Structure formats: structure tokens, C-alpha cells
Amino acid sequence: MTKTLVFGHKNPDTDTICSAISYAELKKAQGADIEAVRLGELNSETAFVLDYFQVTAPRLVQTVANEVSEVALVDHNERQQSVDDIDDVTVTAVVDHHRIANFETSDPLYYRAEPVGCTTTILLKMFRENEVEVSKTVAGLMLSAIISDTLLFQSPTCTEEDKVAAQKLAQIADVDIQSYGMEMLKAGADVSKKTVAELLLDAKEFNMNDNKVEIAQINVVDVNDVLSRRAEVEALMTQNIVDKGLDLYLFVITNILTNDSVGIAIGSKTAVVEEAYGVKFVENQAPLKGVVSRKKQVVPILTDTFAK
């Protein structure tokens, strides 16, 4: 039997890690030889989740073609967000909830993408469709992913399907959604011990009308906890622009209590962000009122503005 590795995007978040583990458990129950791995360091929120449910973190890998010939992707499809040697392996399956871009295969594959708030919402359907029982531990991981991606149902990406899935998973995991959810989000929002690199850990690269754009996001309970370190943050953003040849680096600092954000933008195309949101950046900083979702409120808006 051919072994498969399953993983989410680089700079993994809670959905990416928990989806990879959950997908692997589903496929193992069906007899597959599969292992969940990760493409980067865990953030503090995900570390809290794995510790809470006593789950070992997936193994960290830099490449995959040296181990397997087939892989499955969760929570992403764009090549620049995936493993560096993705072109050297066959993608046999994708389960995702993002736009489809910069993705093609030479062979047929299982591809499932739905416009929901979280990948594990889709995975819960797959468990049920295949009549595979969701364990208490996996239910906890899947619930955590939904809470994370929907900001405890406050994000505009959240759908009724996500809410229903979360209720079902909470029953299996035997946790109270509100109390556990706030504890989890606050664990991720504590930036007091984070390095500057860790502040920018949740970053994704996009191609927008032939422009290289990187968008990082962090959830906090007080944006000043990050803005007080703005000089260090901007220095690292500038270095990333040089190292990766970026046209724009946007850092979205989201207050999970007010559901507003502040943006820091650096690069030759910062005017695009100003046009997209009708704001003016002063010393690289501007308010982004009501913006909490990179997927729904940042990527599509910037993509459309770059295309003008």
C-alpha cells in the first residue's frame, strides 16, 4: 500500500493542523496508510488546543518527495502556500474552503471545496458520509478549528453549517463551546511572550494580477500590544519584502473583542490597500473597521482592486 502524507498550508494555523489530523484519522479508519504532517511551527493557539486534548503535534517536514509519491492537501490549494516540492508529488485529494488559484494537476483527483467557515466542517460531513465515528479527541480538534476560523462564530465567513457542526462536535467532545472557545482564543491572542517573527507567523502569500502579496494576521485583545513593537515588526516585514520579492506586505492586527482591525502596509503597492478600503495609511498604519477575515474581507477585495 502506498503511503500518503496529508498537510495544510505553510505557517499553519489551528484549522490546518486539526484538519490534517482529522483527515488522517478518517482515512486510517478506511484502511489507508497515511500520516498527518505540518509545514511550520505551531502557533500558541494551536499548541493550547493540542495540549488541551492531549494530542501529539504532527511531524514537521520541509519536503515530501523524499518520503512519498502521493499527498493530500487540506485547508489550502495554492502552490505557493504548499510544500516547496509540491510539483514533485501527485496530489490525490484536496479538502478546502478557500478560493482556487494557482492549482492544477495532471491526473484526476478527489477535490472538495465548500464555501464554509472551516475545513473541519466539511470533514465532519465526510466522516458521516463514510459512516466513520468521530472520536472524542478528534471532535475536540475539529471543534477547535471551527472556533478558530470563525472567531467563535463572529467572523463573516461563519455559516449556519459551521454552527451546526460545532454543536454536534461539542456534544461528542463534551466541552462547553463558549467557555472553551474564549479560553482558546485568548490563549492565541496572548502576544506578551511572542517574538516579532511569531507575531507575523500566520502569513500567506498570494498572486494578485501578477503581484506578489503577503498577508499576515494576528488576533489580539489589545492592538497596542502589537503596535508598541511596530518598528521591529516593520523591519521584519521589509526584510520579507526583500527576501521574497514582494510587491505588498499587509499585516492585519485583529481585536477579537471589538471585531475591528488595524493594518500595517509596506511595499510599492500600498496604494492598492488605500483604494480598496478607502483609508489613508499614516506611517504605514490605517484602521480597517469591521475587518476580521483575511479570506472573505481582505483577499477578494485586494484581488479585485489589483485587477482594475
Curated annotation (Swiss-Prot):
Catalysed reactions listed for this entry: diphosphate + H2O = 2 phosphate + H(+)
SUPFAM superfamilies according to UniProt: DHH phosphoesterases (SSF64182)
Name of protein: Probable manganese-dependent inorganic pyrophosphatase
Keywords: Cytoplasm, Hydrolase, Manganese, Metal-binding
Binding residue positions for Mn(2+) 2: 15, 75, 97, 149
Location relative to the cell: Cytoplasm
The protein's enzyme class: hydrolase
Binding site for Mn(2+) 1: 9, 13, 75
CC cofactor note: Binds 2 manganese ions per subunit.
Family: Belongs to the PPase class C family.
EC number: 3.6.1.1
Molecular function in Gene Ontology: inorganic diphosphate phosphatase activity; manganese ion binding
A GO CC annotation given for this chain: cytoplasm
Cofactor annotation: Mn(2+)
